[in-house]
Each structure stands twice: as structure tokens, then as C-alpha cells.
Amino acid sequence: MLADSVVTNEDYAKRAAELGHSVLSSCEHGNQGNYRECALLAEKYDLHWRYVSEAYFVKDRREKDNTNCHIILAAKTAKGVGDLNFVLSEANISGFYYRPRMDMELLLSLDPKDVFVTTACIAGVFKYGEEEAEKLILRFARHFRDSFMLEVQYHDTEKQREVNQFLLKL
């Protein structure tokens, strides 16, 4: 497993329990390969496991285009887990170009009753510029409604501050 973090899943689970949290999730880019480890850790620390993946989004998964961006997908229900597995598998089958990529067709096949979607980090839709990012965000929001969230993060960098200001204006 290649991680974007300096702490282990065990560290996260233990700390979440210490802080009185009720939910644990961990996401990987393009798949959910560590779900078993995290589900067992959630059980060990008496936390509810949330199935999540940081997917790669592109405008058309069938085009050989490497300008992908990140988007977070989280299951709310057991059906949502199955649906996420399906779209992640389909991204590998019909959208693989360097990475398993999904497009609007796959994303909008997800039922808002069963999944949450967020804009992810600064490597999210903001990579396409403000005008295109706003169009995509509005389309996501229309479909997912209350199951769609803008992800404001605190990283003390100029780029993160710009993204946060853009999100707050929306």
C-alpha cells in the first residue's frame, strides 16, 4: 500500500477512539484496497467503518487523456458499497489510462441515497480552472443534492487558500 500519510491506519483508529469519534474511514486513490484492514481496526476500536475511495475523475474515461482530478466517494449504505465497487471496477475496465478513471456517466450512476461525494483536495476539479470547476460542482450538486459536499481543507499554502476562497464564494 502506498500512503499519502506519515501515520498508520492503526494510529488513526486509535486516535479516533481516544477522541470519542464514532466513525473511521480511510481512502486510497483509485480503489479501496485497504478496506479489510480498516474494517478490522474499526471493529477493534469500536468504531463504525465507512467505505470510501478517492477516485480519479476525467471528462471522458474512454479518451486517452491524463488530465484527471480527484473526487471522494463514500458509501452510506450496503448498496452504496456495492455501487462504489461497481463504478471503481468499471473505471478499471473501461477507463484505465495510467489510472482507473471515471467520468460523469459513471459518477451519475451512483444513487445519492447510497453515497456521499466531495470535491476532494486541491487536486480535485479545481485543476480544470474556476469556470470549469464551477460547472462540474453545480452538476454534482444537482444530482447528489445533500449528499454532495465542498471539501474545505486547512493547509497553509497559497494554492489551498485560493481554492478555499473559491469554494466559500460558491
Show where each model-derived region lies.
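Phosphodiester-processing cores and adjacent nucleic acid-binding clamps
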Residues: 1-170
